[in-house]
Amino acid sequence: MKAVTQEPPTGRPARPSLLAEVTRFVGALWRPGDVREVRIPKHDQWGHTASGYFDSPDTLAQAALEYDGKANIYLTLNPTDPALLARSVNRIKPRAENTTSDADILVRRFLFIDIDSVRCSGISATEQELAAAEDLMERLTHELADQGWPDPLTCLSGNGYYVLYPIDLANTPEAANLVGRVLAALAQRYDTAGATIDTTVANASRIIGLVGTMKMKGDATADRPHRRSRLLCVPDTFDPVSEALLEKLAGDRPPQSRPTSRSRSGRVRPLTDLLTDAGIDYREQPPDGSGITWY
């Protein structure tokens, strides 16, 4: 098991190094002309979502870090329509009215493999739980390399690991289906009792945790601390996975939802957890006369 550096809940790196880490991650995703959204769900006591659009990695990182340690910060993995910059030009609005939809994405640049440790919902991972996710990541990346896949960008997400393989796909229903089938095949092959691959992240407008910022689930405790996400490996070149390799892995497997929406006990995770993880803003209403809670 590799040692995983984590911060005490009360500390954080010096701001210059922190800014450099976030900028390095964003810069690894960026191409000239890109625009991306920063989104911060439920950042205040009223449950508002903050959002802003940026055409510069440096400006994005500086603005996003104002929320670091206050709420979980996310970024659209794929570039958005540049016209969306006019919603909030290189700044974050604390009460966003609109966020990015699948139709707003120009192209699919990355296959997002989100590896999470199996644990109860709403809490951070222990070192042992995190190690299970690391083992899955290492097995997956080594075996895909043996099959001719290029080197991915890898990150500690806080409670698991991100693996990002460059791809070059149009934003079409066919591409969404292919990505969904690839994730389903990977989950079928690599999921364990201690860690799973999230198969629900195939949509084009998927948001990803902003690497370099704190990831907070529940309260920080000695055995379940809040950890700062960080880059692990950035390849020297971003060679896209060919569509042929994607199809070979996907085979005829249909896209499917895996039990990542369930807790360790097998119970279905609360809808509020799923909405928050997806970065969807919501308001919970009191149960009506039939006992139904509306969102």
What are these regions (language model features)?
Residues A222-V268:
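Long, charge-rich alpha-helical interaction segments
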Residues K2-N159, P166-A185, R267, L271, ...:
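Signature for HUH/AEP ssDNA processing cores
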